[in-house]
Amino acid sequence: MKWLKQLQSLHTKLVIVYVLLIIIGMQIIGLYFTNNLEKELLDNFKKNITQYAKQLEISIEKVYDEKGSVNAQKDIQNLLSEYANRQEIGEIRFIDKDQIIIATTKQSNRSLINQKANDSSVQKALSLGQSNDHLILKDYGGGKDRVWVYNIPVKVDKKVIGNIYIESKINDVYNQLNNINQIFIVGTAISLLITVILGFFIARTITKPITDMRNQTVEMSRGNYTQRVKIYGNDEIGELALAFNNLSKRVQEAQANTESEKRRLDSVITHMSDGIIATDRRGRIRIVNDMALKMLGMAKEDIIGYYMLSVLSLEDEFKLEEIQENNDSFLLDLNEEEGLIARVNFSTIVQETGFVTGYIAVLHDVTEQQQVERERREFVANVSHELRTPLTSMNSYIEALEEGAWKDEELAPQFLSVTREETERMIRLVNDLLQLSKMDNESDQINKEIIDFNMFINKIINRHEMSTKDTTFIRDIPKKTIFTEFDPDKMTQVFDNVITNAMKYSRGDKRVEFHVKQNPLYNRMTIRIKDNGIGIPINKVDKIFDRFYRVDKARTRKMGGTGLGLAISKEIVEAHNGRIWANSVEGQGTSIFITLPCEVIEDGDWDE
């Protein structure tokens, strides 16, 4: 029904009336023009053929005067052929007074020469001695054409001696008329199109002010006061439009102030680093920013309209009345999956009359702070524990020595030996802690050198092989020299830590394997150090590089470990743009993998 409504509009009605007037005018002009043009073209065509025929008549009369009727046939044939070279001429015949065809220009009709013509128009021209014409349809091989037949009698000494019969194709005239009509139709169509377009614009100048005021009225009813009605004149409609604009402007200014404050508040809430939740006076959530949604791990549609205390899982601990009385902050686990902890502060929205209209909860993410605090406490506890154990042991032995054990020649050396071992263990622990502290503060310098890795790793293996007799070392190292760039002292510490652990935890026929594999495509090499020890449970493999972590604390402490060796090794390897990780099968052994950058340098390359 929308099109019907549009059709009934004042704008459309004006355009339709305007177009109909143009169509009627163009039809009248076109009819008058085509009729007169057709008459003019036909008259010109017939006039040309008539003049042409008269020239031919004069020529034939001369032939008859000179040669007579008996010897004139050949010359008349030549005359007809000469005059028949015009495009519009279909055929010319000369027929004598006895209606015998003397000559013809059409080759296919040469057989009709010396035969009698039975055309009634020819008989009429010969009998009356007057020219005549008529239209016929005739096929010249390309389809039927309109043909204008013209007969003109030839007189010598005022006696009719014959008749000139001319068939002229008049199709070109009608084709020309059709072309002109087509041009006129196209011109009319273009004129109508332009008329419609102009009609819309012209009608628009009349209906636009009324339409604008109608639309403005609708928009104002919807609360939109931004539009303005264009004033086209100083008449009554223009005055009405001016009144509309003044009304819209005043209301818009008041609304703009409100919207500006609202947008400013929304922008602040949206871009805050803290989560914001605002509720109505009943505690139902009405506003929540993106940060709060991220902290809660919820979508906006899953939280709007729900009770704030229920969303924060506090309905059993707090009531809305308590929030008004107590503004203290507290910690809250918001997202257990991500371990997110937030400090929550509540406040109330109160009118000047004291009426509470809503509540606001501010969520501040303190997860990182809590994590740092927890790690600090764990570190202090671990260091305290690691120092307390040897100190307690040393204190016990020193007390025993003070009580007289130093006199016992067997016990005194043992007590002193244990005290020395515990002292050395504490020194190692303190040194490891100092090194870790330097790495954390990035104050531990790394002095890189280009190293022949084959020679480097073999030297370390040889040293450990000479220091023990109960462990077999198996080497799978490429013969081709691999060069790398690292701090030899730091990497020696890494390999010593890994090899020492492999030797400590191997059992039975102790065996430590070394496998070195190079990937030239990525300029990386992988070192695998495998033992046949007790192995590590699969759920604890990733934790062995944590500080102070021990799979078996009693066994590790008994063997003199501090729990920091692999943690230091990881820091050193990563500082060399490398990676270290472990694979283990419990009861079968553990493999430590180390990847480092490397280069394959041919012997001749050093000479460049």
From Swiss-Prot:
EC number of this enzyme = 2.7.13.3
Gene Ontology BP term (one): osmosensory signaling via phosphorelay pathway
Query: Is Cell membrane tagged as a keyword?
Result: yes
Spell out the SUPFAM superfamilies in the cross-references. ATPase domain of HSP90 chaperone/DNA topoisomerase II/histidine kinase, HAMP domain-like, Homodimeric domain of signal transducing histidine kinase, PYP-like sensor domain (PAS domain), Sensory domain-like
UniProt-listed Pfam families: Cache_WalK, HAMP, HATPase_c, HisKA, PAS_9
Cellular localisation: Cell membrane
Q: Where is the HAMP domain?
A: 204-256
State how it assembles: Forms homodimers. Forms homooligomers.
Organism for this UniProt entry: Staphylococcus aureus (strain MRSA252)
Q: Quote the record's activity regulation.
A: By zinc. Zinc-binding negatively regulates WalK kinase activity and thus autophosphorylation.
Q: Record-annotated residues binding Zn(2+)?
A: 271, 274, 364, 368
| Modification(s) after translation | Autophosphorylated.
Full protein name: Sensor protein kinase WalK
Check the record and name the PANTHER family matching this protein. Answer: SENSOR HISTIDINE KINASE GLRK, TWO-COMPONENT HISTIDINE KINASE
Q: What is the lineage of its organism?
A: Bacteria, Bacillati, Bacillota, Bacilli, Bacillales
Q: Which Gene3D superfamilies does the entry mention? A: 1.10.287.130, HAMP domain in histidine kinase, Histidine kinase-like ATPase, C-terminal domain, PAS domain
Chain positions with Phosphohistidine modification: 385
What membrane topology was assigned to this protein in its record? Answer: Multi-pass membrane protein
